Design a protein with these regions (language model features):
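A short hydrophobic beta-strand segment most commonly corresponding to one strand
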Residues: 52, 79, 93-110
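Short, conserved beta-strand element in jelly-roll/cupin
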Residues: 34-36, 45-62, 101-104
Length: 144
């Protein structure tokens, strides 16, 4: 495998949230999550993976399975070990740009995500994904 480069850039969206994969190796994936203010995801964990998130813009509040908050502002991050249940919300007054690093332990796990109700996801987000919104043509968030 060769070295590769990437840019922290993602389209603006009209609502909801998006995820754009930036690069990957056999044991690591990196991506950029983009959430409009107020948007959150569901309580979940990642078997076989540790995750790191760094706030590039906006504000994120991460919650553990007991719903205890940890507020992160621009330039702050959190590391989440395998089997740690969490969810997060864009809690600032501007969209949240969140750099994500996923490190796999050993070979690729068969189950990539499990929510609090036991629902499992086995497919990896390898394409640009927008949930509950549309991209805004010609408008982008990027690290400057």
């Amino acid at each position: 495998m060769e070295a590769s480069t990437f840019k922290l850039k993602t389209p603006h969206i009209t609502g909801g949230r998006s995820h754009i994969p930036l690069a990957q190796t056999e044991h690591m994936t990196i991506g950029l999550n983009y959430y409009i203010p107020g948007r959150k995801n569901k309580l979940h964990t990642h078997p076989g993976e540790d995750h790191t998130f760094v706030v590039m813009d906006g504000q994120a509040t991460f919650y553990n399975k007991d719903h205890q908050p940890t507020v992160l502002n621009k330039g702050e991050g959190i590391i989440l070990p395998e089997h740690h249940y969490y969810y997060f919300q864009s809690t600032g007054d501007r969209p949240l740009a969140l750099f994500r690093v996923s490190a796999k332990k050993g070979t690729k796990p068969k189950v990539l995500r499990v929510d609090s109700e036991g629902n499992k996801r086995t497919d990896e987000e390898i394409d640009f994904v927008v949930v509950d919104g549309e991209t805004v043509e010609g408008k982008f968030w990027e690290l400057t």
